[in-house]
Swiss-Prot record:
Residues 792-803, 824-837, 892-903 have a biased composition (Low complexity). This is Arf-GAP with SH3 domain, ANK repeat and PH domain-containing protein 1. May function as a signal transduction protein involved in the differentiation of fibroblasts into adipocytes and possibly other cell types. Possesses phosphatidylinositol 4,5-bisphosphate-dependent GTPase-activating protein activity for ARF1 (ADP ribosylation factor 1) and ARF5 and a lesser activity towards ARF6. May coordinate membrane trafficking with cell growth or actin cytoskeleton remodeling by binding to both SRC and PIP2. CDD domains: ArfGap_ASAP1, BAR_ASAP1, PH_ASAP, SH3_ASAP1. The gene is Asap1. The modification Phosphoserine is found at residues 732, 741, 854, 858, 1026, 1045, 1059, 1146. GO terms for molecular function: GTPase activator activity; phosphatidylinositol-3,4,5-trisphosphate binding; phosphatidylinositol-4,5-bisphosphate binding; phosphatidylserine binding; SH3 domain binding; zinc ion binding.
Amino acid sequence: MRSSASRLSSFSSRDSLWNRMPDQISVSEFIAETTEDYNSPTTSSFTTRLHNCRNTVTLLEEALDQDRTALQKVKKSVKAIYNSGQDHVQNEENYAQVLDKFGSNFLSRDNPDLGTAFVKFSTLTKELSTLLKNLLQGLSHNVIFTLDSLLKGDLKGVKGDLKKPFDKAWKDYETKFTKIEKEKREHAKQHGMIRTEITGAEIAEEMEKERRLFQLQMCEYLIKVNEIKTKKGVDLLQNLIKYYHAQCNFFQDGLKTADKLKQYIEKLAADLYNIKQTQDEEKKQLTALRDLIKSSLQLDPKEVGGLYVASRANSSRRDSQSRQGGYSMHQLQGNKEYGSEKKGFLLKKSDGIRKVWQRRKCAVKNGILTISHATSNRQPAKLNLLTCQVKPNAEDKKSFDLISHNRTYHFQAEDEQDYIAWISVLTNSKEEALTMAFRGEQSTGENSLEDLTKAIIEDVQRLPGNDICCDCGSSEPTWLSTNLGILTCIECSGIHREMGVHISRIQSLELDKLGTSELLLAKNVGNNSFNDIMEANLPSPSPKPTPSSDMTVRKEYITAKYVDHRFSRKTCASSSAKLNELLEAIKSRDLLALIQVYAEGVELMEPLLEPGQELGETALHLAVRTADQTSLHLVDFLVQNCGNLDKQTSVGNTVLHYCSMYGKPECLKLLLRSKPTVDIVNQNGETALDIAKRLKATQCEDLLSQAKSGKFNPHVHVEYEWNLRQDEMDESDDDLDDKPSPIKKERSPRPQSFCHSSSISPQDKLALPGFSTPRDKQRLSYGAFTNQIFASTSTDLPTSPTSEAPPLPPRNAGKGPTGPPSTLPLGTQTSSGSSTLSKKRPPPPPPGHKRTLSDPPSPLPHGPPNKGAIPWGNDVGPLSSSKTANKFEGLSQQASTSSAKTALGPRVLPKLPQKVALRKTETSHHLSLDRTNIPPETFQKSSQLTELPQKPPLGELPPKPVELAPKPQVGELPPKPGELPPKPQLGDLPPKPQLSDLPPKPQMKDLPPKPQLGDLLAKSQAGDVSAKVQPPSEVTQRSHTGDLSPNVQSRDAIQKQASEDSNDLTPTLPETPVPLPRKINTGKNKVRRVKTIYDCQADNDDELTFIEGEVIIVTGEEDQEWWIGHIEGQPERKGVFPVSFVHILSD
């Protein structure tokens, strides 16, 4: 028995009833054993189960104690809900009461509609409050009362109180048993016997009373436990069911109550819109009246009074500043004798709890206050005085405050004289910096990097549309959205700031010190290009604000434009289509295409559909992996406009890992500006810094180390091909009179003039002239392409890169030349359906060799990897004496050759008699690359204006390398194998004229200004070397060959003559005679006449509408792509017209 008691003490409180141990007894077993003992005490085995009863009671007591603790916590939580609900009901009743009173005020002030609405909402609140009160009563009656009854009744007290009667009965039984056991052993000892064990049967009769008491207390305890089980289980759950029904009734009744007002609420919403419109109109009229009164009074704001000051505070400060005529500092005026620079010591009050004065070394220079720290290893703090205000302390004559944009500095000078000096220097330095900023000047200590930044900003401001605000059209915007690349006015920029940096990040071009990395998008987007996408679907009437619009109108429009993308063009129907467009935009390096998919709501950091270097690559991974110094703007746009820079590929590599793996320090700079997580590891357990160290990428390692230590400067410079505008152009003296203005009027884009083969890769498309976007053409300068090689599929001279001219007719798939034509100096062979962009250059001509039309262009140094324009200021090629010629002179050859070729193969013009003179073209190939926006017709016209239409005497011809034989007749020329294209379908072409229609030897004056297509085709079919065949679709619309001037035909005639008569050269590389010397321009002032070759419908009021075949008298030039003139004989029909839509008449 003692051992049983000791075992009971080892039980853990964690044991539970449903995890009974073997020495416990169940209720059914207790009943059976007790009944048996009651009927037959001597044969019963109940005494052996006494220990089990004791163990069972102990474990039951522990379980009840655990339940008591849990139910007390439940009761506490429910009471808290009830109390807070009562408070909520009381607050709702108060709210309903004051709302009803407020509505009554409206009813008494001739606003019955608004008053009724407030009263109805008050009634609704009261009804809902009543329902909530009923719900809380149900909670109190069903849950709280039940828990209170249980905890204060059956479970009252502490652990062990319930089993005290049982413990007493157990103790009495054990005492009596010990006493009888001792007596039996003594009795046996007296008779010389030893009793080792006493059975229950022997003492059954003697212990019956104590055993019956034990059984009674055990039975009482089990009955009590059973009652508690019922109350804490079944009864409590039944009351929770009642509360559940009360909750259901609460929500159902609440919904019914709210539905009663549904129709009224819908009608009220419409009425409120009309009321708001009326009130807005009143406000607008009052605002206009206020501004009118203010302008007439010219009062200082302090004299106007509190009402005006309050209205100023509520209105936009930016709006009020923009209406001021000039800037007035309204601040301290320092003593100019102290200058604007000073070094010394000041006492600065610390920001800690103690607020102690600390002595700090300070310096003022170039508008910057430098405050050194106590330790020399920390970088000093630098404050831009332009954004600070100096405020003297009225209480202490030696103290003053410096209020910056984010904190206030408290300074104290050593004495009053030193105080005056510091105040004066700070004020003078700030005033000096402000004056320099307003005048556009810079400090004397600027370096080349600041010069570059200034040049970039100037170039950005010259982009199309950047002279007005992107949102409201205000002139001269100076606030830049660095993540969108657009310029806004100060009023609209304030709304951009309110939207948050995840939508638009605003910086000032004048007040902020920008790094070149913050100008990447501004250099490549521009307001016009951005609005072509984001405002493509503006409704009519347009909701776009004007410069005079108030802030409410601006905010509604800007939010719809930038947050909702409500006015953008939609081109993709599904998310997969958007991802495909995103992939193509990155591959083709097309920023505008990227902005288009961004406007359509694509998730920029979604894994791309096409597998890349690693599974799970995003567009940013791909952009970084393929980035170079020409595509950083794509990386910048993705970095600034995507949400999560920590996206990982399938192997755990983030974009930072890619920068280290592929050695992209410039991309890394752009990424670190947005503060991504730098310590993410991939599957190999490496961070981006670990990879940079392993691969010895020192630049990436340094940048990542700076970012990890928090020392990275976000205003960082990036190495990028800026392609800035060149101010000093390589031009002759004759050009100075006609030099166009650097800022051009932007017009609606015309069809592109470059046709490309489908085999061109997306990366190479950007290098092709036809793929230059209007914004690129507007900002690239005269010399931007002097060092550039445009690789096309068929040309020995680059086609004009302008996109303003109509498209050239493409070659049909089955009509390409089958062999290398004789006039293809680059050795290019074109197939029927595909072409290549890699051209092999021939060796340069030997020294002394004169340049002719059949020679290839001079080898130019290769441009940067993007095949775009390389940095400005470089010249190439040997310069001849004709360098100072008219700027259109050297491009006359390009006008003839490029216009006579398709995108799939060269087109050789029909030959003309050799009497027609050629110009000297020593620098034609060089100059043909200079102008990027001038169509071929422009140069053709200029060349005709600058030369006398007469033939030089034969004696002036230079020596010829090969003597030319007499010119054979057309019918005597047999076709050469490989030179003739397949015969065109005659059914698709106009009737062929007879050969007799062609003059045998036309003079310059006899040449028609516009030969017919039939004449040229007749020559081609009769045996002339010609690779030019127009598609039937183009022939039916217009005669493209008719665009060529007689000079063009004469040049090709001599070129073809040379190829036929040279016997010592191969057919594919003919030798041509040296062209005739160039004549001096003496007819520069003659009237210029042009003939229209296409129909043109005016897009703007000042443009000229015409049809094909009309003659226009040129009266001026708006810029190099748009001329001014009127229809011949109809001077009332005048306006500007595109040069690429006309053909210059030679007269």
